[in-house]
A protein has these predicted regions:
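Short acidic/histidine-rich active-site segments
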Residues: 145, 168-185
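Divalent metal-coordination and catalytic microenvironments
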Residues: 20, 24, 90, 142, ...
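Short, glycine-/Ser/Thr-/acidic-enriched flexible segments
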Residues: 27, 147-149, 178
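Active-site metal-binding loops of divalent metal-dependent hydrolases
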Residues: 1, 25-26, 95, 120-122, ...
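A generic, well-ordered mixed alpha/beta core segment in the N-terminal half of proteins
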Residues: 2-33
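Histidine/acidic residue-rich metal-binding segments in metalloenzymes
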Residues: 6-16, 36-116, 124-140, 154-173, ...
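Glycine/Thr-rich phosphate-binding loops of Rossmann-like dinucleotide-binding domains
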Residues: 30, 151, 181
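His/Asp/Glu-enriched short active-site or ligand-binding loop at hydrolase and phosphoryl-transfer sites
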Residues: 139-151
Length: 197
């Protein structure tokens, strides 16, 4: 479900959904990075789909969690309350640092117990070790993905060092696979886990 839609989140929660991602490829910050005018940039796989949609005349509006005053939008606050009420997992998606610095403390304040800081070593969602530790202080877990390393967006040693410094108990690993040009998710997870060992 796209957008910041509390009703959709409520209905999803009632249907048993356990995880809510905040905006990813349609986030204003992510779109600005992917489409910054650099013709030589190696874009994310999904960016080619956005370009195809635009060529077909399909609108691709962007989403920001903050209002014009730099505060979290009311819809975001409503979504946080729903996540807390149903004990769902909040994943930060590809939101900007400014959005995350507001979202995570507010989520914790409103009773969200399960928070994932998505792709902490990915270029657009990269967080320093200090930032990661700050998020952990709110109960968050920091996610590291196979594809970030495997596609050359981060050095493996950087990821491993982040995990050591933040603490393995405060980190989770995933693959971020599903792209048909790469391996299957289970294969990626196995390779990533083996390399981390």
């Amino acid at each position: 479900v796209g957008g910041l839609n509390p009703t959709a989140v409520e209905m999803a929660a009632r249907g048993g959904v356990k995880l809510v991602w905040f905006p990813t490829c349609d986030n204003e910050h992510e779109m600005a990075y992917q489409f910054d005018g650099n013709p030589n940039k190696k874009r994310a796989f999904w960016a080619s789909i956005i370009l195809e949609m635009r060529e077909e005349g399909i609108q691709t509006p962007t989403i920001n969690c903050l209002d014009e005053k730099g505060e979290l939008k009311k819809e975001v606050l409503d979504i946080l309350d729903i996540i807390a009420r149903y004990d769902m997992i909040l994943a930060t998606g590809h939101i900007s640092h400014e959005e995350a610095y507001k979202l995570v403390p507010e989520a914790a304040k409103r009773g969200v117990k399960k928070i994932v800081i998505t792709h902490v070593s990915f270029p657009t969602t990269y967080y320093s070790v200090e930032d990661q530790k700050m998020f952990v202080s709110y109960g968050a877990k920091c996610e590291h993905c196979y594809t970030t390393w495997k596609t050359g967006k981060a050095e493996f040693d950087t990821i491993a060092e982040m995990i050591r410094e933040v603490g393995a108990e405060n980190c989770i690993i995933g693959t971020d696979l599903g792209n048909t040009k790469l391996c299957y998710p289970d294969e990626g997870m196995e390779e990533f886990a083996q390399k981390l060992l």
